[in-house]
Amino acid sequence: MQFTPLLTLTLGLFLTSRATTVAGPAMNIVVLLADDWRSDTLSCAGNPVVKTPQLDRLAKEGTRFTHACVTTSICGVSRASLFTGQWMSRHGNRVFEAFKTPWAETYPGMLRDHGYYTGHVGKWHNGKFPASQFDFGRAYAGQHWMKRADGTPIHVTQRNEDDALEFLRTRPADKPFCLTLAFFATHAEDGNPLQYLPQKETLSLYQDLTIPLPKTATAEALSKMPPFIANNEKNESRVRWHWRFDTPEKYQAMMKNYYRLATGVDTSCGRVLAELKKQGVLDNTLVIFTGDNGYFHGEHGLADKWYPHEESIRVPLIVRDPRLAPAEAGRTDDALALNVDIAPTILAAAGLQAPVTMQGRDLAPLYLSATPPTWRSEFFYEHTPLCDKNWIPSSEALVRKDVKYIYWPDFKQEQLFDLSTDPHEENDLIADPAQATRLVGLRSRFAELKKAVQ
């Protein structure tokens, strides 16, 4: 299908005090996707340590969602949800296999079918990279330090940046474009004793700082986890905790290098944005920055992700939309935005109708409309990995901003947290008689939401 330029991308819904008209060709799309980047790893989110000036500026020019979450906290599954707009129960990807959803129903596939020049750069964690489905594809394996064709070393973040800039500089000028830049950072190099290997340019950062331990990075907090985690040193989140955080010295070294990797990604994001501005297309480009999952930094005695706790499921989400009136830029929005909302948001910005298979929603009305729509107040979380339950147990949850009901299906165990009074999930209320009536309602709603996403 040939692409037909739109006279304007502003729909009637957006002709309000929060929107400005963007006339001309179809909107370009750039998705900046970080790895294992939890929601508070931004200085604009209140983090007192990490330096992210470029992403802070992006937030000032757009909208930052303060309660963005993933529906499954693991890279391959979450990325499948981001591309397809579907929960794991529907797209069927439970590990790192190729997409089961038809490619024509993903956002890159639909955009290419409608005349977009599409590119993917960096991490691809869903089977063999489908190079033929993109006009420009640079996906590769590896973590942190790699080698160029001539054998000289290059950091993977620099390679991600270089490939993204090549896409932008070689793209055809007569087509709208969509670039997904999937950074490898801040993922650890599992198996390497150092875990995090940042760029040389960032090694001087954070040297003289002492990074505070999280409130729940304690043996007591671990003891409150279910016994199949707390008393199981074969549990992968405990294994990786020992890799990274089991001594104060190790914690400081790991966290400083994690933040150095984050600052390196921030710098590369800034250079991509600068290239868009240099080419005169920034103000006709929807830019989205987000992460594939959250991350435990020792909270509850854990490392990595997988589970439905706040540190694991919450991710950064910044949307810079050129339709947003300048006076409205820099706002935050506490709506429950999800990774499944990214694909419908992209397609709507391109003037396309999301396929009925997509379960997410267009985020734009939340920040463009003077009277934002009624939005979800809860969602179903799921993670059912294809592995031994003693290594990574399956977990499900009903998540609201003020309460969370967790179910561990492998062990038929429940947990209940009142997030309004216990935001760090320290006090499990599942056995509290005062919660009995509330629990009946939560169990019922949990079952309804689980069925609805299938």
Question: Which residues does each predicted region cover?
Answer:
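Bacterial N-terminal signal peptides
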Residues: 4-16
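Conserved, charge-rich beta-strand/loop surface module that forms ligand/interface-binding patches
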Residues: 420
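Formylglycine-dependent sulfatase
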Residues: 2, 19-408, 413-414, 423-444, ...
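Extracellular C-type lectin-like domains
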Residues: 417
